[in-house]
Amino acid sequence: VKLGIPHIFDVQLGYTFQRSHYDEPEVWSDNVEAVRRMFRTPDHYAYFTASANITRKFKASLFGNYTGEMLVQHNAGYIDADRSELTPSFWDLGLKLSYNFQLTNTIGLEINGGVKNFLDSYQDDIDRGAFRDSVYIFGPMMPRTFFLGLKFTL
């Protein structure tokens, strides 16, 4: 869905609901009961972007993704035995502010800055050490990250 008032405000959003299952239960470990639910496939996913032109030269944008709970495999090593884990749902939100300067009739400069993953959504049970499960990773890949940028336009 995309809504807005041209040159003032716009918002775009989407939502996906799905149930992903195998026809027959999948066995992935001798220690874990077979399941039909597909791993790493959340039932709920959503995204949005919203932008507002505060003034003719100043713009603010808010953007984000929502990922629902999902089942992931957690292999033994750091933990005592293989197990299936149900992850928490999480939001990954960002904010960007930008200001535009017209340097000449044909050259523009945008200065921007913001923060990605400002809620600092991050997996809090990452395995560590030599026996960690290197594929037991879910959620945003980056912690809270600040950024600055310049953009020239012709």
Where does each model-flagged region fall?
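Extracellular loop and loop/strand-boundary signature of outer-membrane beta-barrel proteins
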Residues: 28-37, 79-85, 133-138
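Residues that define the transmembrane beta-barrel architecture of outer-membrane proteins
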Residues: 42-46, 89-93, 107, 142-146
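Outer-membrane beta-barrel transmembrane domain signature
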Residues: 85-92, 154
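Surface-exposed coil/turn segments at beta-strand junctions on protein surfaces, enriched
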Residues: 4-6, 41, 53, 86-88, ...
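Small side chains
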Residues: 4, 14, 60, 64, ...
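C-terminal beta-signal and adjacent terminal beta-strands/loops
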Residues: 68-73, 99-154
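Membrane-embedded beta-strands of outer-membrane beta-barrel proteins
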Residues: 11, 48, 95-97, 148-150
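Gram-negative outer-membrane beta-barrel transporters
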Residues: 1-75
